[in-house]
Amino acid sequence: LPLSNMISLPDEEREVFYRDWRILAQDYLLIGKINQEPGSQLVQVQYEFFDVNREIKLAGEVLTGSVTQLRDIGHTISNVVFEQVTRVPGAFTSQLLYIVSEEAGPGLSLFKLEKSDYDGARPQVLLESGEPIMSPSWSPNGQDVAYVSFETGLPRIYIQNIASGQRRQITNYPNTNSSPVWSPDGNKLAMV
């Protein structure tokens, strides 16, 4: 809804007039404000989410973090709003693992294992190799990733810690070592 069409601009519950939003054919209303003390890197984000037709507040809280965490705070709020409307948990704080293949010269490729936000923002390279990388799989605790690398000339499965970058080869079978998948408790890997 364009700002110019809004009848009122509430930033807290006592300023919400449901009739204004019904006139504008809006089913839901999300309002909020960000407070930051001068000279501080901390912000407080206060939001409230309303069902206009039922005239009730569905959710609201104050989230605190650094200025650099505003995107994450926004995604957290998006998860709450999405779940309130759909009854399905939001995925806005999810991260992706994927492989990027780039041309590195005539007949050469560079393969990168990357992670990013669910929308591709904030990509981070976890591994670069001149040999193919495939089948990345998150550990259930989100701290490690298993993947297949051909850096030895043969497919081998590695586990790498996301934070430290430490990695270790865990397979050396003579044939195929592929498609690692973590057990729900994160203590075992299934593979082909």
PLM feature spans:
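Multi-bladed beta-propeller domains
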Residues: 2-9, 117-134, 160-178
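A flexible loop/linker signature enriched in serine peptidases of the S9 family
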Residues: 89, 101-112, 128-131, 148-157, ...
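C-terminal/domain-edge helix-coil "capping" segments
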Residues: 53-125
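Hydrophobic beta-strand positions that form the internal "hydrophobic ladder"
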Residues: 96, 142-146, 186-190
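Residue-level detector of Asp-centered blade-edge/turn motifs that repeat once per structural unit
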Residues: 88-92, 140-141, 184-185
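Short, solvent-exposed, polar/charged sequence segments at loop or secondary-structure edges
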Residues: 1-43
